[in-house]
């Protein structure tokens, strides 16, 4: 039944628009939280000012989301915010700065060690989101923000957006605590970086440990773990599809 509702509502443009708006708003607010935390801890006044300016731009895009009349506009605000966010991403790296310099997000292939970390850990999050969609009866391939493509888990990609900043924080922790180092990577011609097999196993362990950490869910008003959040959000999404909730309520990181 829930998949029938999902398929039907994925064809309703107004419903898709509201879902996409909520998803992106949640992601951008969580990105803002990451940068706000960095700004509070930064001792470099120039960097702190750059971060505050980036936060201001993201906050402006959050407010513009409310007036967006198309999914394309929402994607535009998300894309602009992502560019702003990643423009100050390097300031969040305190240790091993030279070895883990970050200039911009590159995916296929990852052209820095930090990009390789992000891509690998995002892929673990994607797999978790596919699993929780299936667990609550949703079709992970029928999305609302992301268009459907053959073999693309569009709904899982939708669901993971608000959790990407959690991965970003984990990456900063691993680098700044020197739990990941240059020796964990292979560099190929063209400045293409890959994580070696043994280090991938260690990263999976770090990811699983992060998932065990307790966190408070403000809307549900319960204590949870980081790993349970995608499942809880998938259930909220299912309730939205059934009509129990008027809008999808993303997880906002306090």
UniProtKB/Swiss-Prot annotation:
The Gene Ontology biological process terms listed for this entry are: CRISPR-cas system; defense response to virus; maintenance of CRISPR repeat elements
EC assignment: 3.1.-.-
Name the Pfam families for this protein: Cas_Cas1
Q: Which residues are the signal sequence here?
A: none
Q: What class of enzyme is it?
A: hydrolase
Q: Which residues bind Mn(2+)?
A: 78, 146, 161
Which GO molecular function annotations are given, in alphabetical order? DNA binding; endonuclease activity; metal ion binding
Which NCBIfam families is this protein grouped with? cas1
Subunit structure, interactors included: Homodimer, forms a heterotetramer with a Cas2 homodimer.
Classification via PANTHER family: CRISPR-ASSOCIATED ENDONUCLEASE CAS1 1
What is this protein called in UniProt?
CRISPR-associated endonuclease Cas1
User: What is the originating organism of this protein?
Assistant: Leptospira interrogans serogroup Icterohaemorrhagiae serovar Lai (strain 56601)
GN (gene name): cas1
